[in-house]
Amino acid sequence: FWSENTHLTVGGEEITVRAGSYVRLCRTFTAGESILLKLDMSLRAWAGEERMAGKASLFCGPLVLCADGYYDGRLNVEQLPALRAESLKLLRVEPSGFAGSTFTLECGGETLTLCDLYTAGSSGSAYTTWLPMTGIAPKPFARSNPFRLQKVGV
């Protein structure tokens, strides 16, 4: 559902992939053949409702991003600045000191380093997946978008 722009190459042959569906590979592979899967890693957000109103969970592809002071020492997860959904820009993704990655974003001329949910809190630090965000409204549930995600950023 989230990967609208997926590319799959099997043994050098491009395979058509439709968002929200599975691809079945029925073939005999030969030594040295490879499968290359490129997923849509654009930024998306899930707007919070009720007690999470005014906040959103941010995704980079299938990965949930988190604010964790260990990865960005300027962050206090209890007092995060509000991000503007329309101005978010992913600058870079780098391996973290653990098994996951860090994601450096720009928003309104400021940078912010987030981590993936897998490594969040692994140093014993506090973290949150719900980030204060403006310019985003909740989307209703739909079978075509069960996670109610929407593209954000530039």
What are these regions (language model features)?
Residues 1-11:
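Beta-strand-rich binding/interaction modules
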Residues 2, 29-31:
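Short loop/turn positions at the edges of beta-strands in beta-sheet-rich folds
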Residues 10, 16-18, 27, 34-154:
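C-terminal beta-rich recognition modules with glycine/proline-rich loops and embedded aromatic residues
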Residues 22:
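Active-site-adjacent structural elements in folded domains
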